[in-house]
UniProtKB/Swiss-Prot annotation:
It comes from Klebsiella pneumoniae subsp. pneumoniae (strain ATCC 700721 / MGH 78578). This is tRNA pseudouridine synthase A. It catalyses: uridine(38/39/40) in tRNA = pseudouridine(38/39/40) in tRNA. Residues 168-172 are annotated as: Interaction with tRNA. Substrate binds at Y118. Homodimer.
Amino acid sequence: MSEMEQQPICKIALGIEYDGSKYYGWQRQNEVRSVQEKLEKALSQVANEPITVFCAGRTDAGVHGTGQVVHFETRAQRKDAAWTLGVNANLPGDIAVRWVKHVPADFHARFSATARRYRYVIYNHRLRPAVLSQGVTHFHQPLDAERMQRAAQCLLGENDFTSFRAVQCQSRTPWRNVMHINVTRYGAYVVVDIKANAFVHHMVRNIVGSLMEVGAGNQPESWMAELLAAKDRTLAAATAKAEGLYLVSVDYPAHYDLPVLPMGPLFLAD
């Protein structure tokens, strides 16, 4: 038995930030770039053994994360700096470990989570941006953020989100519990901030797509409630683009004592 095999297995959680614009999503896939594949490769180099990670939320192609949480198991005995600075040295520049925490055996990045929070960032200006073009969604028509805010409040609580669910969604149920949804303007940026126990596929982007129709004056404020009641995806607006969406935080029971960082995206006020 090798010295590595004699070491006890420990479970470690990491906070991950990434720019998803050059990846085909979080999940490892054959022959395409994924965030999971890059992270596992870097961790395996530091651990000197194969590492498999489990995440809180599998983001789609082009979607970003400032508050993704993962866990993995390893026999490798390393200082915390190895799992942060060491792993970051082996990662591409658009993925970074933000924190590390040793967690008990019952912790699971996905199944221990009690809520997930996303922010969708709209650059609301008649001319398109260049510097942040892969980190925001450009919408050239003027948006009334206060109108969007009022229209969105009907989504609070536990509801059937069939009208905002992708056709290919594999979830067993369309019911989700939305804890808050806020629409706020920061200068030229309009941010939709939504927190729920979980999300059906494309739920945030489908909600934002419809809210932009309300904000632009193309639909009345009451339209969001009508869509929710209709339970018909074909009645809602087109899915908003991926580049404006960020997974910004994941909630866990307090006894895990995971680090809490500023929400992000970092170019906006928290």
